[in-house]
Regions:
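Conserved catalytic cores and adjacent C-terminal regulatory segments
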Residues: 1-339
Length: 339
């Protein structure tokens, strides 16, 4: 939604609008339910009969904000992973792919609703889109996190494909010249240090326990966490091997606990707590995966996440100026290469 244009072809939302948006709409997207025996039992009963939430308010808000804006309208190049439950394969809505496959130029509202349809939490999203020949194509989408919970590699693969095709936007970079990549990867926090589960307990679980246990969703947590961690580990290994680790910034907090790590507890108190955690995260030292033990550890140089983001912003600004100097007539109206 940050890349959607307003009527003046400026961003519809700024980063500063994210917090107020969640504070206003979060409690309505994820309403608190209680029932006989308390919230946990009420949620369990609801989950057995369908998605935990009907998604109606989320759909309403997204459609109201994004209207008729389509993928080709975005102010930056984007790639948005989803998963098609009918064809059982990932679907990537990419600014570059769309130019070749016109049926991928869907409404941003449909793409956003589809990629946020987390299994057990929100319903799958089905819609059709017309290609340039008038043919209808159907999509049956669920949350892209099931295939790319950390979509960093997805974005890098899109860039690599364009380099192979000799797209002038990336000249003269070579396909695997990762030292020329500038990567910012922002996580949503984990409760790794809380150690909610253990082998002795899990050994006794049946299907229902794996799906929901003490207010958590173990099976979902395991798949999403491992998927994100493997991407981070891979990128850390590659960038360190190429001596370009300063070009990869992973911002993540793995010290969450209790309701802080919940997917859907959107009470005012919890959202304020998460906001404070985010602010404090800016002041923390840049951390990186230790390739020996797999732990996310702060670096010794003392650079904070805030300083690292400022450094990246300066590099991007300089790169933009250089491109404009080299080709002032062709770059003026090009989209920034941000994924």
């Amino acid at each position: 939604m940050l890349t959607a244009p307003d009527n003046n072809h400026r961003p519809l939302f700024a980063a500063k609008d994210i917090k107020p948006f969640y504070l206003e709409h979060g409690p309505k997207i994820f309403p608190h339910h209680s029932g006989l025996g308390g919230t946990i039992i009420a949620n369990l009963v609801r989950s057995l009969g369908g998605p935990k939430y009907d998604g109606k308010y989320l759909h309403e808000v997204v459609r109201e904000k994004l209207g008729e804006i389509r993928l080709h309208d975005t102010l930056t190049n984007v790639v948005i992973p989803t998963f098609d439950i009918k064809s059982m394969q990932p679907i990537l809505f990419s600014s570059y792919q769309m130019k070749k496959c016109s049926y991928m130029d869907a409404k941003l509202s449909d793409i956003c609703i589809g990629t946020s349809a987390a299994p057990t939490y929100l319903p799958a999203h089905t819609f059709t889109n017309q290609d340039s020949q008038g043919n209808l194509h159907q999509f049956n989408l669920i949350d892209g996190g099931v295939c790319a919970n950390n979509p960093t590699l997805v974005a890098m693969n899109e860039v690599t494909k364009q380099i192979i095709k000799q797209n002038s936007d990336f000249f003269p970079i070579k396909p695997l010249e990762y030292s020329r990549f500038l990567i910012i990867s922002i996580g949503t926090g984990t409760a790794r240090n809380e150690e909610k589960f253990n082998g002795e307990t899990a050994a006794k679980w049946g299907l229902l326990d794996w799906l929901t246990y003490n207010g958590s969703t173990p099976l979902t947590d395991v798949f999403t966490q491992s998927s994100a961690d493997m991407v981070d580990f891979h990128l850390s290994a590659v960038t360190q091997a190429l001596h370009s680790e300063d070009n990869y910034l992973r911002i993540q907090d793995d010290t969450l606990s209790g309701t802080e790590s919940s997917v859907d507890i959107a009470t005012k108190e919890n959202l304020q707590k998460l906001s404070e955690i985010g602010q404090n995260l800016l002041k923390k030292s840049v951390s990186r995966v230790n390739l020996e033990n797999g732990l996310f550890e702060p670096l010794a140089n003392g650079e904070t996440n805030q300083h690292a983001l400022t450094r990246f912003a300066k590099i991007l600004s300089q790169e933009r100026r250089l491109r404009e100097m080299r080709s002032p007539h062709t770059t003026k109206n090009k989209k920034p290469l941000v994924f």
